[in-house]
Every structure is written in C-alpha cells, then in structure tokens.
Amino acid sequence: MEEETHTDAKIRAENGTGSSPRGPGCSLRHFACEQNLLSRPDGSASFLQGDTSVLAGVYGPAEVKVSKEIFNKATLEVILRPKIGLPGVAEKSRERLIRNTCEAVVLGTLHPRTSITVVLQVVSDAGSLLACCLNAACMALVDAGVPMRALFCGVACALDSDGTLVLDPTSKQEKLQQCLAAAQAASQHVFRFYRESLQRRYSKS
Amino acid sequence: MAEPASVAAESLAGSRARAARTVLGQVVLPGEELLLPEQEDAEGPGGAVERPLSLNARACSRVRVVCGPGLRRCGDRLLVTKCGRLRHKEPGSGSGGGVYWVDSQQKRYVPVKGDHVIGIVTAKSGDIFKVDVGGSEPASLSYLSFEGATKRNRPNVQVGDLIYGQFVVANKDMEPEMVCIDSCGRANGMGVIGQDGLLFKVTLGLIRKLLAPDCEIIQEVGKLYPLEIVFGMNGRIWVKAKTIQQTLILANILEACEHMTSDQRKQIFSRLAES
C-alpha cells in the first residue's frame, strides 16, 4: 500500500495581449503532484503541468564507487531519460543544469563520501519540459528526506521578438527583464502549491 | 520567432522568519528560518527600532536550545532542512530551553550513535564482521563485542545472520561501528537473532511511532498472538509467532498500520481475534 497525495492546483491570473511580451500577469497550466508512489527509491514524485509529466526517483545517501567519491561532500548524479530513444546531447546539458541547481541547494557536506542519485523519466512532453523536470526533482528530494537549504522550482518563459525590436539591444534586454520578473512572480504560485500538497500529506498522520 | 528560456528560481527564505513557538505542530518546508523565543522580543514590529543602551547590562538569559534532526543553526536562527512537522520538548530538569526537531517521514536510514539496529552480516574478514544496516556503508562489528567472547571463545556468527546491536561510532566522517554489548559488558537482548521469523522493512517514522512509550498498536498486537518482535531503528522489524501464517499476518498488519486510522485498526484486530 502506498501513501499517495494527489494535489491539484489551478492557478490563473490575467493574461496579457497576444503578441506583446508577457506582462506581470501570467497563466500557469494545471498542476498535479503525487509523492511516494514508487516502492524501491528512497523518494519519488510525479509532477504534471498541463500535459507534460515527469517521474522522478531519488536514491540516497547511498554507497558510492571509490572513483567517484568526494571526500567532504556528497556526489550528486542526475539521469534524465527521454520518452523515446536513447539519451543524447540535449539530455546531457539538461542533466548538468539540474545537477548544478541541486548541488547549490542540497546540504552535501552532511553526507560526505555518499552518492545522491536523481533519476528522471519523461512520461509525456507538451512544452516547458525542463521546468517540469526541476519541479519533479525538488519534490522527490523532499520526499526522500535529503537535507536541503532551500526549495527550488522551474518556470519556463518565451521571448517573442518583433521585427523592429530585435535590432535594438536595450529593448531586448528589457524584454528579458520582464520575462525574469514574470517568472519570479509565477514561482510564488509553485511554492504555494508545494506547501499545500505537503500539508495535505502530513495532515493524515 | 520565440526563444524559450528557463528560469530556475531559488526560494527566498520566506517573507519573514517566523517564531518557532507559533509554528509548533505545523508543516515546515526546507529553507524556512525560525526565530527562537529569546529573539522574538528583539525583532519588534518594524525591525529597525533603536533600543536605548542601558548602562547596567541586563542579565541576558541565554537559554540553551538543542537543535534536533531536520534543523540547523544559521547565525542566531534555526534553518529548516527537512520537510515535516515541527516538534518541541520541554526540558526535564529545568535547565536549557528544550529540544526542537522536525518529524519527517523517510525511508533511508543514516547511522546515529546509540541507536539500536538490526543488521545482516555480509562478510567476515579476519576479526571483523561487515554488517549491512541500510545506510551508505556497511558497519563493522568486532568478534570481541559479544557477551562472554574471548580470543579463544569466538561467537558463532555466520554470513547471513541477523544481528541486533547498537552503534558506538556513527558520524559522517568515519565508518560506523557497532557492538552487541552495553557499557557494562552485558548483552541486554543484543546479539544474534535466532532462527526462523520474518524480517521486513518499514519507514523510519513508523518505527518511532511504534516505539513511543504508550503505543496502542503493540499492546493490541500482543493480545492477539504470542509473539517475539525486534524493532531496529533502521526501519527493520523481525517478528516470529508460532506458525508461519500468524507471522505473515502480523507482518502485514504492522506494514499496513502506517496508513490506517485507529478505528480501521481496531476493526481488523477484532476480526482477527474472532477467527
């Protein structure tokens, strides 16, 4: 029997106009998350954003090969498997980005000479895959009880470039700043969702 | 033309650090900062209030608060590192400010000094047994750490045996070491666990719940069948009853009682007691 917490959250804010860069209001797709669904890994989570779904499993702190051990902190490994085909260069670059994020957040110095492995499997891809992978990895690390100094999440945003404005670097920078601001505002929604789903899980005990 | 760009945002440490007292019993997330009671008075509404310097230094009562699992000290605040419910225990003898800890649910065990665990012997090399305790490395157990063991009188331990012992050395930098005697040299229930019976794994939170001082589950299980049971803090339980069927029933009940409410449990026990 597995402990499952199904938590759905619908976050809608006002949508900006079509072609112009996104304003402060943003609309995120429907979220759902399930924790502790796999019996073998120490922590697991499945994260759904609209139609994109990623399954994450965390093993750790576990034994590490002598060639890979680091004397004063934990060795973090991320494995990302695409839905079809063998992992390629794009997966490797995403793995590196996720690993850098996790390393900044996980307190590796508490478990030296051990390994923490995050395995991500893409179940379906309908946009913003990297953001969904980051969210699933974070929920799986929390489920496994790996000590962390903060939580992290991912929000994807797209830049629309109009013909005339591409040439002007400053307004391009402006658009980037607007994207960053919108993503930061949206990340508060994701954190609120994390809190609600974890409270629901612990409210049963 | 659209270029996707992903932004990974790290959670800031909440809007404001909350007082630990107000969060007791609630779910806390990694990254939250908690204020200890003595700091609450200093951080009044509005933060940057100037306090007049007093010439006679008021006896600042420094209360010693112990940071338990799931919490770390960062500066003069507590940083939450695991997700779970915040708990507090008042100090017994009156000194110190008590213990704060986070009650989290975990499957993976990390060795802690003084914990009693069930291990499986995996190798025998010279005078040392290697015992798998479910952590990141196997613990070492010397053959002299059994009651009445001498160099001539070696204990009868084979590869694959179950051992119930406690850790004497368990920190992040060294290989864990366990022994099967207490500080007086007596076995006190530790040592090789006998024949038959069933070993199974549960979460660490369930073990702590079952080992709590007044746990109804164990009393009810004891009334059901005569049994022998050993709890290891590493999530392993060994149980033995008269017949194999009873042993399996007990194992299933203990695994399932993590997710059952007390009413469902009483129903199942009454049904089993009838049959």
Swiss-Prot record, chain B:
- Positions carrying N-acetylalanine are 2
The main location class comes to cytoplasm
Instruction: Determine the domain of life of the protein's source.
Output: Eukaryota
| GO MF | 3'-5'-RNA exonuclease activity; RNA binding
Keywords from UniProt, A to Z, are: Acetylation, Cytoplasm, Disease variant, Exosome, Isopeptide bond, Neurodegeneration, Nucleus, RNA-binding, rRNA processing, Ubl conjugation
Question: Which residues form the Glycyl lysine isopeptide (Lys-Gly) (interchain with G-Cter in SUMO2) crosslink?
Answer: 151
Any one GO cellular component localisation term in the record: euchromatin
Q: List the disulfide bonds.
A: none
Q: Where in the cell is it found?
A: Cytoplasm; Nucleus, Nucleolus; Nucleus
PANTHER family per the UniProt record, alphabetical: EXOSOME COMPLEX COMPONENT RRP40, PNAS-3 RELATED
Q: Report the function annotation for this chain.
A: Non-catalytic component of the RNA exosome complex which has 3'->5' exoribonuclease activity and participates in a multitude of cellular RNA processing and degradation events. In the nucleus, the RNA exosome complex is involved in proper maturation of stable RNA species such as rRNA, snRNA and snoRNA, in the elimination of RNA processing by-products and non-coding 'pervasive' transcripts, such as antisense RNA species and promoter-upstream transcripts (PROMPTs), and of mRNAs with processing defects, thereby limiting or excluding their export to the cytoplasm.
Assigned protein family: Belongs to the RRP40 family.
Q: What is this protein called?
A: Exosome complex component RRP40
Q: Whose protein is this, by species? A: Homo sapiens (Human)
Q: Which gene encodes it?
A: EXOSC3
